[in-house]
Amino acid sequence: MASDQDNSGLDAPGSQFHRPILQSMPDTRQQSFDEIYGPPENFLEIEVRNPRTHGMGRHMYTDYEILCRTNIPAFKLRQSSVRRRYSDFEYFRDILERESARVTIPPLPGKVFTNRFSDDVIEGRRAGLEKFLKIVVGHPLLQTGSKVLAAFVQDPNWDRNAW
């Protein structure tokens, strides 16, 4: 009579179906200081901060500082800081949509028509723009395949009309 362990000889030693029991050994190699505390293999950090309002009356606008830190080769600078207006983000998003038809580009925070220069509105917009950029720069196809992305977050002379 065959036991529960007997699979019609499939696991019998010498059988072509014999599966030896594998013991997993823990990795006991010590990591180096650089491996533990060094920068990750590829990283891209984006921060939208330091909003500033300029102008008077109908000519007022707010711009935002974009701080970028990365070691991805598609980006020319390891660290950069540029300033962009909301309208620049709108153009950038439109360019991304045309350039990257296979990628769904997230929406920007909505336009504000009343109290648009109040601290709460400016902070809400800053947070929304940062969320938008973090999603965009986190997309692997855009990180390496977008021509406009690196320029938008790193080039202080970025010209929306050049795209």
From Swiss-Prot:
CDD domains: PX_Grd19. Gene3D superfamilies: Phox-like domain (3.30.1520.10). Residues 1-20 are annotated as: Disordered. Disulfide bonds: none annotated. PROSITE patterns: PX. InterPro entries: PX_dom, PX_dom_sf, PX_Grd19_PX, Sorting_Nexin. This is Sorting nexin-3. It comes from Gibberella zeae (strain ATCC MYA-4620 / CBS 123657 / FGSC 9075 / NRRL 31084 / PH-1) (Wheat head blight fungus).
